[in-house]
């Protein structure tokens, strides 16, 4: 297969990004479609593929960590395809004149490149690795934004910049414009236009908490004793402009072999999970800003479930973890990653950045995480890639940033409540039952506090982001927790751990840990490997 044919295949992908459906005033639905299926339906009548209903149906593509949504920006509208990311908060688009994309627009930098190789996933799905130079040419496929061609764009001259863990970089200024998808329109929507990009030919639609927005640097602004520029991002504007009732969304990736998943803004689909939907509080991540937490929860322990040996706990270390659909791999504390690797008699390979082991050991093994009285289990094969007779376990070691990516989330149903600062989780159901959607008006319908809701790691105010002291607080009632939350803003102004004490018998102990305060992005060489793999089914 020639490299150019792969890029042509990516071009054919875009023909299927047709937006169908209608809107409702209470919730918005984004079906998640996998890339292999898009190739198959490209020549079909789309009306036979998508079910039209009373909610917004926007095609979103799942490429193992890459979710793509079609957006129209400006007047007249310019079409872009943005990566949907639950781990960041800004909508960022690349400027049409950006040097990073413009220098490769003629394809001369990749036409003679054949730096790619075929590999395979554990399930036998073929995949392809392409050089980053070739991937950069995809700017034209994702689309760029020309602000000078939009009569409604206004630049507010507020600077932003951000560097991800793999070196991916954006820098530019914020502005406002009209954004639409199907018959949903957001007016005066704030987003960033990147004038300097490294390593990312696409834009991003971040849907995390606004506290994680790039802006001109939160810590920098506070150091200068000025209020940081924090704006209402995409989920917030959906509520502000009457599209949803609650700033919350549920994520369902569906099984590895399924055709569709979904993201529901402002609602929960009870048919997409089995068992109880349990709720956990988000952890305090940005201490210098008072009581605002980050989209991080507590993992109590990790176990391996094997049909032969049963339940085997590999670690009972508590750690803060982000459930991040924008990350393919999982990044766990080094001692936990080592314990998981050794449970398969694996040997760590620095070249593969993972544990190498005999593929026969996978079988029906599950990776199970205890989140505080309930467990979510994911098939270990989700974390495994294979080459010849060896398997690589893609559970990465980390000293500071802990994340469970989409290899784990594919087996979970997750509801992110950005107003109540809570995350609800259940085991995903793949029974293809009829939708049972319920609007989120206050708390998440059907969810109940986890047994370990009040025994969770929280951050000590005043600790630097990235490292810091955590305080294990055991609460006995919601009223106590409410008292605790009201004290956070005051406690944030001092380094006094006693400010966390509450009446009613709560207890606390302090342990030095690393937090998950930074966003980490998988390298684009692997993202492309995953991205292409679905085309080749």
Curated annotation (Swiss-Prot):
Main location: membrane
Record's GO cellular component terms: extracellular region; fungal-type cell wall; plasma membrane; side of membrane
Membrane topology annotation: Lipid-anchor; GPI-anchor
Modification(s) after translation: N-glycosylated.
CDD domains to which the protein is assigned, alphabetical: SAP_like
Compartment(s): Cell membrane
Keyword terms of this UniProt record: Aspartyl protease, Cell membrane, Cleavage on pair of basic residues, Glycoprotein, GPI-anchor, Hydrolase, Lipoprotein, Membrane, Protease, Signal, Zymogen
Proregion residues excised on maturation: 25-52, 516-537
InterPro entries (UniProt xref): Aspartic_peptidase_A1, Aspartic_peptidase_AS, PEPTIDASE_A1, Peptidase_aspartic_dom_sf, SAP-like
Signal peptide start and end residues: 1-24
Residues of this chain annotated as glycosylated in UniProt: 57, 149, 156, 161, 183, 195, 311, 363, 375, 379, 472
Residue intervals passing through the bilayer: none
One BP term from GO: fungal-type cell wall organization
GO molecular function terms listed in the Swiss-Prot or TrEMBL record: aspartic-type endopeptidase activity
Pfam family, any one: Asp
Family recorded in the similarity comment: Belongs to the peptidase A1 family.
Protein task: Cleaves proteins C-terminally to mono- and paired-basic residues. Required for cell wall integrity.
Designated name of the protein: Aspartic proteinase yapsin-6
UniProt organism field: Saccharomyces cerevisiae (strain ATCC 204508 / S288c)
Gene behind the chain: YPS6
